């Protein structure tokens, strides 16, 4: 039997998104940087794990820096991004480092906003550690 020749569909065109939103979710265990378009559709992302770190090293500021750099470089090269609004969530050690890394990678930061959820006396927090 002769093999059927597969026809490819039209290639996906490159979108140019000059302005985006960088969401930085920084916990004590990891930092996740997600870059979206203004509507909230994810374009690219990076985390301490995708930067090559495992275990407790994912929560370090250096891991956050590499994660933000990776996400920013991809956003610049693939989508032509120039400006970002930064929304930071969480209490982790990688917050400031990730913002600095976005700026160092060549993105212009127009806004930094803290969107950390604060309970109005909600769930009981975890107990204090005794080391």
Swiss-Prot record:
The yes or no answer to whether the keyword Repeat is present is no
Look up the record and give one Gene Ontology term from the biological process aspect: translation
Organism of origin is Dictyoglomus turgidum (strain DSM 6724 / Z-1310)
Q: What does this protein do?
A: Located on the platform of the 30S subunit, it bridges several disparate RNA helices of the 16S rRNA. Forms part of the Shine-Dalgarno cleft in the 70S ribosome.
Q: Molecular function terms in GO for this entry?
A: rRNA binding; structural constituent of ribosome
Record flagged with keyword Ribosomal protein: yes
Q: Which UniProt keywords apply?
A: Ribonucleoprotein, Ribosomal protein, RNA-binding, rRNA-binding
Supply the name of the protein. Small ribosomal subunit protein uS11
Complexes and interactors: Part of the 30S ribosomal subunit. Interacts with proteins S7 and S18. Binds to IF-3.
The family database entries (Pfam families) matched by this protein are listed as: Ribosomal_S11
């Amino acid at each position: 039997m002769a093999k059927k020749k597969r026809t490819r569909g039209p290639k996906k065109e490159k979108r140019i998104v000059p302005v985006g939103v960088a969401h930085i979710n920084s916990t004590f265990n990891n930092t996740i940087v997600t870059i979206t378009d203004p509507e909230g559709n994810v374009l690219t992302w990076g985390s301490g794990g995708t930067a090559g770190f495992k275990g407790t090293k994912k929560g370090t500021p250096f891991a956050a820096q590499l994660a933000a750099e990776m996400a920013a470089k991809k956003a610049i090269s693939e989508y032509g991004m120039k400006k970002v609004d930064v929304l930071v969530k969480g209490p982790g050690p990688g917050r400031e480092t990730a913002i600095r890394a976005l700026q160092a990678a060549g993105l212009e930061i127009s806004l930094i906003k803290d969107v950390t959820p604060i309970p109005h006396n909600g769930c009981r927090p975890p107990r204090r550690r005794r080391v």
